[in-house]
Each structure stands twice: as C-alpha cells, then as structure tokens.
Amino acid sequence: MFELVIKNGYVLDPSNRIRARLNVGINNGKIAVVTKDEMFGNVEIDAEGLIVSPGFIDMHMHEDSYNTESDSFDFVISDSMLKMGVTTAIGGNCGIGTRKPVEYLNAVDRLGYPINLGLLVPHESIRYAFGDFNKYEPVDHFYIDGMKEFLQKQLDGGCIGLSLGIEYDPGIKEEEATELMSIAAKNHKIVTIHQRSDGNQSVSSIEEIINYAASTEASLQISHLSSMCSFGNMEEVISIIDSYRMKGLDIGFDGYPYYAFCTFLGSAVFDEGFLEKYNYGDEYYAKLHVASGDLQGIEFNKETFYKFRKQNPEALIIADLLNEGEVDQCVTHPTAIVVSDGLYSNGQGHPRGSGTFPRLIHEYVVNKKILTLDAAIEKITYLPAKRVGLSEKGTLSAGADADITIFALDKIKDEATYQEPFKKPSGIEYVIINGQIALKNGEIIKNNLGRSVRK
C-alpha cells in the first residue's frame, strides 16, 4: 500500500527516456516505484488519458515579496506558477530580488510555500549590504572583499548561485563581476547574467560576459536570450555561444515563448535612445504598453513616454518589439531551457507569469509542431534540474522527490493575455508537490507544500 498512487497515466520522463502507460507509487514524499504492475494507495488518482510528467521547473522567475514584520508572504507569482504546473522555481534572477536570501529561504521552510523554491544571490542584495550605490557607477575597490564575504555567506546558507543584472546596474565593471563570479565558481555554483544590453549591442554584451566566465571558470547561464537578441542578432549570438561551448566553456541559455518583453519603466532598459539599439524609429513608442492596472491603455509617443517614465518608474511596460522567428529559434534550440521570467508587481504583469509552460506545449508542440512533446518536457524538467544541480528534481526515477505534473495534452493551453495576465491556463489537472496533492482539477487545494531548495 502506498500513500499516493497515480494510475493509468501516460508517463513521460525524458530523464529516463520513458514514454509508456504506467503507474506511479509514492511514499514519504518520494517516488517509490514506476511500474506496469497494479498498485493500491491511500489516495489514488486515475490519470486515464492524461500525461504524467516530472513537475515543471522554472529556473528563471522573480519571487514574491516577504514581509519580515508580519513574517508572511504575499503569494502572487508563486500561486500562478503552481496553476501552470510548476513544482520548483528559482528566484533572485537578473540581479534583483530579496535583500536577505537565506532569511527568505528559512521563511519558506517555516511557513510553507506554494511551490519548492531556490534562490540565487541577487547582485543588488550584495551591493545594498554595503550602501545605496549609484547604479550607473562602479563600486569602489574598497568594498569588494566585503561583498565577496557576503556572497559566500549566502552560498553557505544554500543559495543556488549568483545572479547579475548588468543592464539594470550598468555600473558593474569587470573587477566587480569577476571577483564575485570567482566565488560562485569556487563553490561550484551557477552564475546567471542578464547581459549589459540588447539589440545591436547584443553581440558585444554576450562576448563581455563570456569573457568573464572564461576568466573565472564560472558556469554561465545567459538569461532570457529570447528577449535580448531577437532583433536580428539571434543566429550570430547562438553561433558564438555554441562555438565557445565546443571549446569547453560551461555556457547555457534560456528563453520564453512570447514575442514581447516586460520590465520596469524606470530601469536602464528604457534610457534615452533605447529604440535606436533595435534600429526602430519613434513610431515604435506606440508598441510600448503599460502592463495592466489603472494606467493600462495609455498610448505613447516619445514625449509622453518619457514624461510618464519620470512620474511612474515602477510601472511595468510590455514592449511588443521582438522578432517572432528569432524567439522560436532560441526556444527550440536543443540546449535551450524554457523559463517564464515571471514577474508581477502592484497588480501588473506579463502573461508569461501564468502561461509559459502550457504555451510551450500548446503552441510549439500541438499547433506549430516545431518541438516534440518529449523535447518540450525535457526543457522544463530534466534540463533545468541538471543545469542547477538538483539531482532529485526533474525526473520520475525511484527515490526522486515526488514532484509531478499531470495534464491533458488535448486541453493544455495558456489563457493569460496582456489584458488579463493572471488568468490560469487550461489542461493542468493535478500538481503533486513533495508527495501531496497541491492542485486538483486546476484549483489549488494546498498552497503550503513547497519547501526551500538548497545546494
């Protein structure tokens, strides 16, 4: 007798190259057995006609806020993650996130969380620990040793790695970047980087961070390449990455299957002259939209855009500027990992935070037929788990963590839009986290089963 049994489902496990009608037995939060044999459980799920997959892993998202005074989380993005089949996510990306990562992880274990969560040490938290620095200026050499000690302490506390957001903090120069990256490398932990710039500066920005990785021997993950290099640069950039990988450098990249990016209006992304990087004229200001909320629907020209930016730097902007073919080229590359870059703020957001993984399957597998189902599932399970070193995630092997997503292939579809970014997807039937049912028939029934993921 098992605590939980999933019966009659079509098990798809890329890590073991399994695709067959099998039963799954679960005990003590772990997968006990995957077999054709009949099994019985205290709780049973009949998965007839459904796909049984390792739980989806999102290795690039932005975690919910944590209030230290009330010792509570404001679950927004994490609930959306659960509803689209995510069982484990990695926050702290792009160099931004919680100022005290280990304290945040401790709260996850103490209070519970909708999904399992790991954190990178965001660069801004390292800088913030030593003062409120000008983001456009380099840090004085005097602070570097202390910053390295702060990073080491967070890594010792179980953080997955380091993240840098060079575009958001353009004052980051070689010394600061490489000194911190060397600490991550010595700890055998990943470094994720949001590169310095995009558009016609993509190639030089990619070469900059690859050089940093080469000099420090860091494992480099280039963040959301799909939104940084889809302006006529994707083929060249991927060629550069592949060539360095062939030389032995540990380089990976990820992307999301949407043709518009989203970030804060006050960030350096929208500094004066940004459209010139994309070889776009002023008419493209009309392709920039407030994500959602009371200010949604404002139509921009150059003058109104910069006036609005000065008044509302925290507004999230949807930039409908990406080349569809290049996004697809990124997402379908054999080594690409698919991520959401999910971010919600003040009721604003991009639909990727609620729809990325169902969209990948519905659009790329079912509609466009440019990915096989096995390849799509691998990009959101085994590949991210392997990339960040989570051996008990992303697989249905016996002994692995019982994190499982069950979905209907004929129904799975992203429903979130730019007007309704929080709308849950269709077709996600069950989500199992640490051996217990967190979501049933598309509805959350327990949102505290997740625990911290540490390395």
Model-derived features: positions:
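Divalent metal-coordination and catalytic microenvironments
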Residues: 9, 29, 49, 60, ...
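C-terminal cap of metal-dependent C-N hydrolases
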Residues: 9, 328-335, 340-341, 404-453
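Structural signature of the urease/amidohydrolase superfamily beta/alpha-barrel
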Residues: 29, 385, 391-415
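N-terminal metal-binding scaffold of metallo-dependent hydrolase/deaminase domains
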Residues: 1-40, 411-418
